[in-house]
Amino acid sequence: MRIASYNIRKAVGLDWRRNPLRIIRVLEALDADVVALQEADKRLGARPAVLPEKALFEHTGLRVLNVTNGPSSGWHGNALLVREGWRVGATERLSLPGIEPRGALMADLEGPMGTMTLVGTHLGLRRGCRQLQLAHLLEELSVRSPRAVIAGDFNEWSPRIGVDILHHDFDVVSPGRSFHASRPVAPLDRFAVGRGLTMVGAGVFEDGEARRASDHLPIWMDIESQP
């Protein structure tokens, strides 16, 4: 199973043009089963989604999990995309603590690899806030199956510190430097893999239009069920 995470910066590329189809082409090349998006909606008014759902499905086979009743496809900019073949159970929108508004989306999935919980999030700019937010996510996940993956923009520049709170229950996967897309210097985007799942491959996707579609590069991870 391939999971991807991608901060798409509202589909505004390094040429400062909003080009949703360019993002969709990158997602098509990623060929992931599920995707956590960050900055997936516009920030004004009703915050409409930036990716047209019809074109998204036609190019990638991915559908947006409907977690709102309005034109936005997500929550605090987060959106989850799921390929056909995965059944979606309970979904939940989480507000995260901190100085700035942050959130996460949580979904129970059932498919070819069994059941699991996926969390997509975009953590805050201050390390203290990020640690509070991770603690909140761990509390929410504590009543669910340990087969869980957290995916998103962790906003953590250090490859060594800042996510220590996860290490007891999760393996943190940092595929590589994903920001800034023009010259990657920081591993801001990461995964955390819970018990019962094993990472068998991961990377930063730099092919095709990924270098100019957003200020972040997408990351991917392949996982398997543990026997």
Describe the predicted segments one by one:
Residues 1-34, 42, 59, 63-227:
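Active-site regions of metal-assisted phosphoester/phosphodiester hydrolases
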Residues 44-51:
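Short, flexible/disordered intra-domain loops and linkers
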Residues 52, 56, 60:
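Phosphate-coordination/substrate-recognition cap region in phosphate-metabolizing enzymes
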